[in-house]
Amino acid sequence: MTNSFKTYYVSQIDGNDTNDGLSKSSAFATLFAINRLTLKPGDRVLLARGSVFEGQFLQIKDSGTKESPIEIGAYLPESGEKFYEEVLPVIAVNGQGIWYQDYGTELDSPTHVYQGYVSSAVLLYDAEYI
């Protein structure tokens, strides 16, 4: 039996959101393309080394399983320049990625905010095994 895990590639360097994102040569260009997907257990999201995702955020709303987590990582882009081997991708939110969050109850102490606006480059919303 073959697995149906998918690997999605995102490259600000040489991607395009009209691509399917399923190979380095057909990488997406933005994180917004990933945000529109329904990820399944075992799927991987790989960001191209050297990419700077300006004004973008990654919102994962799906869950993996203990046996097949959803993985987020980095890869060397098709351009393959030696420079990129040591450079990790950057998500530069720059004021984007703001959500209103209400946990419905106070958390473990009154100093923790349980409702209000939060900002993050990566939001794991009701997700586990990432």
Segments the model singles out, each with a brief description of its role:
Residues I60:
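Glycine-rich loop at the start of a catalytic domain that most often binds anionic cofactors/ligands
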Residues Q12-A48, V52-F57:
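Acidic Gly/Asp/Thr-rich repetitive segments characteristic of extracellular carbohydrate-active
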